[in-house]
């Protein structure tokens, strides 16, 4: 199972946002929607052995207590179409569910809980995508779990949490998070490994 975790630094954690204003009013939710689509879509199919976690920090002036994690499972997801609005609608629907400490089913293939990066790191051995990391094209083996940031850099607090994790790079230039996910999946495909 391949896993991608994307931190949405300004992403709202409530369903009261407009699908017509995901870049602004939803805190760059459009970036996260593209990451969902990149994680799962093939031509005429979905990657069933992939999960994507969105860590929604709650908006501009967010209280850390309002951070939620959404888990999307390729094995069970339904009603996902290859456009941002479709992914945004699923996120909005999932956020209607009141998050608790453990994952709750919010929709087919989507779960929600009240937690952030620290708890996710306790559960899975993640690697960090960083332009100064080991190149995925030359790495002997690749991890199955990757952490990315949205359009912003990791915060100091996040850097402290991930400082000892292995770091990998998709190349010498900084790319959009969704493009990075596609390149990683392509590398797994080229190696004939899962995903």
From Swiss-Prot:
Summary of the function given for this chain in its UniProt record: Specifically catalyzes the N1-methylation of pseudouridine at position 54 (Psi54) in tRNAs.
Complex formation: Homodimer.
Chain's gene name: trmY
UniProt source species: Methanocorpusculum labreanum (strain ATCC 43576 / DSM 4855 / Z)
Binding, S-adenosyl-L-methionine: 129
Name of protein: tRNA (pseudouridine(54)-N(1))-methyltransferase
EC number: 2.1.1.257
Record GO terms (molecular function): S-adenosylmethionine-dependent methyltransferase activity; tRNA methyltransferase activity
UniProt-listed Pfam families: Methyltrn_RNA_2
Subcellular location, record wording: Cytoplasm
Family of the protein in this entry: Belongs to the methyltransferase superfamily. TrmY family.
Keywords: Cytoplasm, Methyltransferase, S-adenosyl-L-methionine, Transferase, tRNA processing
Major localisation: cytoplasm
GO cellular component annotations of the record: cytoplasm
């Amino acid at each position: 199972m391949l896993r991608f975790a994307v931190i949405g630094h300004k992403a709202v954690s409530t369903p009261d946002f407009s699908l017509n204003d995901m870049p602004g009013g939803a805190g760059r939710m459009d970036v996260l929607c593209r990451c969902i689509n990149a994680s799962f879509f093939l031509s005429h199919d979905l990657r069933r052995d992939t999960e994507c976690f969105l860590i929604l920090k709650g908006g501009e002036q967010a209280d850390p207590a309002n951070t939620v994690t959404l888990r999307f499972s390729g094995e069970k997801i339904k009603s996902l179409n290859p456009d941002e609005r479709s992914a945004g609608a699923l996120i909005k629907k999932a956020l209607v569910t009141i998050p608790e400490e453990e994952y709750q089913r919010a929709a087919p293939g989507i779960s929600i809980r009240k937690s952030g990066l620290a708890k996710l790191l306790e559960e899975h051995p993640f690697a960090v995508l960083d332009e100064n990391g080991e190149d995925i094209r030359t790495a002997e083996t690749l991890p199955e779990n990757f952490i990315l940031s949205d359009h912003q850099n990791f915060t100091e607090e996040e850097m402290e949490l991930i400082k000892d994790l292995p770091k990998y790079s998709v190349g010498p230039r900084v790319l959009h998070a969704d493009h990075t996910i596609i390149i990683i999946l392509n590398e797994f495909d080229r190696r004939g490994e899962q995903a």
